[in-house]
């Protein structure tokens, strides 16, 4: 379980999207004569976006890969060369093992069920969750204490990483405390509802 933390607007999603794209873009498997996988490069990625819709995320990836601003893409203001770039980039993205799930307010149990299905149907070697604080604990464990809820979520993600034997990158918000200090470098204690996050993450 890897935690990628930052204050809002600092580029957590952009970095996570980049990691996911780059891992998926180089994915390939080497097999022996019996068809057994002997080596794997890159990753089959499950991106669980609780903040942005799949469409927003895809537009962001497409804009970055085609080197055309997402504003231009949204408005459809594309020249012929721009359009060709977009078509090329979208074909490239479509062929990648990058699966986006934008179900809002997912519980750990819901995420686990989706990840298991993804692994069974397509294969899965990396999970990205954007972001931790938007997840909900399982309905049976709805608690009044948010710290305990986050603890249940991080423990669930850690267990999922072990069960499926895949790394889980979970994005997390930092508290405002980091902005009050002269030294703005984040510390583990700046993680929102921090105790369990620093305890459960690798």
Question: Predicted regions: what is each one?
Answer:
Residues 2-3, 46:
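Short hydrophobic/aromatic beta-strand immediately N-terminal to the Walker A/P-loop
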Residues 8:
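The conserved Walker
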Residues 12:
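Conserved lysine of the Walker
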Residues 15, 19, 57:
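Hydrophobic positions on the alpha1 helix immediately C-terminal to the Walker A/P-loop
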Residues 25-123, 137:
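Cytosolic-facing regulatory segments adjacent to core modules
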Residues 60-67, 132-158, 181-186:
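Conserved P-loop NTPase nucleotide-binding/switch module
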Residues 148-202:
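Phosphate-binding/switch region of NTP-binding enzymes
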């Amino acid at each position: 379980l890897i935690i990628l933390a930052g204050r809002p607007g600092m580029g957590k999603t952009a970095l996570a999207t980049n990691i996911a794209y780059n891992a998926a873009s180089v994915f390939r498997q080497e097999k022996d004569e019996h068809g057994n996988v002997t080596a794997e490069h890159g990753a089959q990625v499950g991106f669980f976006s609780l903040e942005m819709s799949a469409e927003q995320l895809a537009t962001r990836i497409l804009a970055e890969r085609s080197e055309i601003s997402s504003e231009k893409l949204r408005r459809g203001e594309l020249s012929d060369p721009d359009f060709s770039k977009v078509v090329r980039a979208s074909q490239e993205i479509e062929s990648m093992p990058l699966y986006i799930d934008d179900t809002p307010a997912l519980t750990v149990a819901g995420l686990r069920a989706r990840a298991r299905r993804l692994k069974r149907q397509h294969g899965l070697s990396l999970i990205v969750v954007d972001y931790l604080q938007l997840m909900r604990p399982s309905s049976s464990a709805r608690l009044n204490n948010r710290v305990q809820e986050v603890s249940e979520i991080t423990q669930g993600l850690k267990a999922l990483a072990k069960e499926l034997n895949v790394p889980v990158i979970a994005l997390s918000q930092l508290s405002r405390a980091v902005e009050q200090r002269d030294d703005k470098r984040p510390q583990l204690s700046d993680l929102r509802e921090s105790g369990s996050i620093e305890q459960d993450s690798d």
